[in-house]
């Protein structure tokens, strides 16, 4: 049996519901009951930190939109060295380094900022692309690239979810004040329809809650 808790409050301020859900996760862990905490939208870095700080564990998190990919794990696993090699960077490109990030300058004027994960020691959570001081793109990593977010004036306008080979499996596209969703060749116009597709992919049994 697996117990699924759906988080519908990612975009809201911290509240008592968050604490109660984390307490329940701890209780289920102590009872050795398999449980998943489902993110129904991709959380921003500070939100992910918040939920992890409450006691949730990476291996218990389930990202609904990543289910449309063939990714095996969303847990940060790549080191600075591994990504430095991937981006063909050298020590000469390194401009600054601390416990929280490493900044590289590319020949085309782009600055890459490797943000370290606070809960997976030595691993990079995401890479930010800055041009002329502006954030243009953010790539999230597990064992491979998971998600790419595109920014315009600091606002996310597109989010792509990748298969292990880098191909796009699912996308969120901002259209004015609303969002459209691309799943393969289909365009879905409501989040409700997206969640229906997600639930259809879950390996649910009659014992699950």
Functional labels for PLM-detected ranges:
Residues 85-195:
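Repetitive, compositionally biased segments used for assembly/scaffolding
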Residues 1-84, 164-209:
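Long terminal segments
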């Amino acid at each position: 049996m697996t117990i699924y808790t759906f988080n519908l409050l990612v975009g809201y301020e911290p509240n008592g519901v968050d604490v109660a859900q984390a307490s329940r996760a701890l209780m289920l862990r102590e009872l050795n009951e398999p449980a998943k905490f489902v993110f129904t939208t991709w959380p921003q870095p500070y939100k992910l930190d918040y939920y992890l700080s409450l006691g949730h564990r990476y291996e218990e998190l389930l990202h609904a939109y990543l289910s449309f990919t063939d990714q095996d794990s969303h847990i940060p696993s790549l080191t600075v060295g591994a990504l430095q090699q991937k981006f063909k960077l050298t020590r000469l490109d390194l401009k600054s380094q601390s416990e929280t990030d490493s900044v590289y300058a590319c020949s085309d004027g782009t600055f890459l900022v490797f943000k370290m994960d606070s809960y997976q020691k030595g691993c990079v959570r995401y890479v930010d692309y800055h041009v002329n001081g502006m954030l243009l793109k953010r790539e999230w990593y597990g064992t491979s690239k998971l998600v790419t977010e595109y920014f315009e004036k600091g606002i996310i306008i597109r989010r792509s979810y990748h298969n292990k080979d880098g191909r796009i499996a699912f996308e969120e596209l901002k259209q004015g004040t609303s969002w459209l969703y691309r799943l393969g060749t289909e365009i879905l116009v409501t989040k409700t329809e997206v969640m229906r597709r997600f639930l259809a992919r879950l390996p649910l049994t009659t014992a699950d809650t």
